[in-house]
Amino acid sequence: MKNISFICLFLLLGVACQESNAPKSPVRESKTNISVPPNFGDYWYQGNAELSSYTLEQVRYGAVHDGTAVLVFVTEPFSKSRQVKIDRPEGGKDELTVLKLNKTKSFITGIYPYQLMNSTFSPVEIGDYPKALKSATTVQEWCGHVYSQYNLREKGYQWRSFSYFESEGDQEKNLAEPWLEDGIWNQIRLNPESLPVGDFEMVPSSFLPG
């Protein structure tokens, strides 16, 4: 990889991930007239992932730290009710195809490392489901770690966060239905015309700002 900031290297690789358990809950549909381009499957339905690698300059504790950032995009079958990857050959009416983004940041502050990862799942059927169904973030460093997750339910997003730090602790909130900044990366890949315009509410990224 060339050490040039914000120049990405695209690779193709096969990806396989395991399913995990998640609570069941209905998801509300929101109809629009926007869809993915007709040739979407020529690139995204070939059983491969798109990997983009970046050099990173991360601000933390009042200083700029060098590191690496990686974006991995891939399509996969997804359960609407459980909001996990479907491993069954036929998922039936519960199955949606999503564009998943796994993004990571790795950098060192002083003597100890930071590892961050976010996974965001956006339905390819953006005409029926214009917003991300799920977004989960983990932050690990030597003091402790934090995990947070958004799930789109019938009445909006359910947000849960679990933290090592007393000031954050375990939290749970319900949000009407804002846009998630972490979902914008997928919106651009699916169809830039699906991006929100005008006045709207957006939840900032769960990642540390760059």
Residues covered by each model-derived region:
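Contiguous hydrophobic, core-forming segments of folded domains
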Residues: 28-60, 72-73, 96-209
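Charged, amphipathic alpha-helical segments
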Residues: 80-86, 98-99
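Sec-dependent signal peptide recognition
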Residues: 2-8
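C-terminal motif of bacterial Sec signal peptides marking the signal peptidase cleavage site
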Residues: 15-16
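An N-terminal, globular interaction/scaffold subdomain
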Residues: 65-78, 86
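Bacterial Sec signal peptide processing site at the extreme N-terminus
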Residues: 19-29
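A glycine-rich, acidic short-motif signal
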Residues: 89-95
